[in-house]
Amino acid sequence: GIDVDHFSPQDSTQLRKHLGLERKKVIVSVGRLVHRKGQDRLIESMPKILEKSPDAHLLMVGQGPYLEHLAKLVAINNLSEHVSFIGRIQYAELPEYICAGDVFAMPSRSRLAGLEVEGLGIVYLEASACGLPVVAGASGGAPDAVLQGVTGLVVDGNNLDEIAEAIATL
């Protein structure tokens, strides 16, 4: 389970202001920066998201071996004004950063012919407990953490159109 006393809706107005996101539709993604988590597809879907929501901003919280690749994707797609990398934060700060978002997204996907999948995806439950709708990838246990159409939407983590449409819908 999750600590619902820790992960609950919080006022992130000051954090959003500090990050320059007070007038943005913030898509927050929290997790280790690795291929399986689908952060690359989230970045690649941003142009489609921006067509529907020109004020959208992707806030990526976490660190990992995929950071350099993700930063290159941001540069290649001219998204530096629309994507922020926060890096590692303390556990105590997680709810405030999650609540800085309007929607939580981590379109995870399976790798290596299904041998590498997302586990339960507890971060989806934490985001839901914070009051955010979630977009999860259909990988491993992640779909089990989302009540389709109630707490969020499960998408094909490789389908940029599905990712963008789900985020626009929520």
Predicted segments, located by residue:
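Short glycine/serine-rich donor-binding loops of glycosyltransferases
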Residues: 116-124, 142
